[in-house]
């Protein structure tokens, strides 16, 4: 499951996002919500989170600052930025900070689900790649051990 958190200062938006998607059927687990960027950051420090869905304008720590910090600490976390503002400057900043997607409110459910499906596909691809790399590293260590054992036994017999 892909662990996800929603950060938005408006409870009606947080609850609406929770309810518009069948998270489980898409392969996601909504692990929590946060009322602002600071709460989200605290939550991310305590839990293994893969996706952050955040509003752009929130008290204490806005969505852009949250993404900036999250990407610095956890570059693999996917960030979706939600906003009521269709301003190009916000979109540009979001992209420069490494946001995966920039969605304008009110949320188009189909667009939102497509974004989540794309994240799932990318997440699974990255997970398979990491597993493959781990297997290769293990195989290389085993080959090195085998080579060292053969070298050691060959030297002993001389």
What spans do the regions from the language model cover?
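Interdomain helical linkers/hinges and coiled-coil/dimerization scaffolds
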Residues: 107-158
């Amino acid at each position: 499951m892909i662990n996800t958190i929603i950060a938005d200062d408006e409870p009606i938006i947080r609850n609406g996002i929770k309810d518009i998607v069948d998270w489980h059927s898409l392969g996601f687990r909504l692990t929590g919500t946060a009322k602002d960027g600071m709460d989200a950051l605290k939550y991310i420090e305590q839990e293994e989170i893969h996706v952050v869905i955040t509003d752009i304008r929130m008290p204490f720590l806005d969505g852009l600052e949250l993404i900036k910090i999250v990407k610095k600490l956890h570059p693999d976390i996917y960030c979706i930025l939600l906003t009521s503002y269709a301003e190009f400057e916000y979109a540009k900043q979001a992209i420069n900070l490494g946001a995966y997607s920039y969605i304008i409110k009110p949320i188009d459910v189909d667009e939102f689900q497509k974004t989540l499906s794309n994240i799932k596909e990318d997440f699974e691809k990255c997970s398979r790649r990491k597993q493959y790399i781990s297997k290769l590293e293990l195989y290389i260590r085993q080959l090195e051990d085998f080579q060292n054992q053969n070298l050691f036994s060959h030297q002993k017999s001389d």
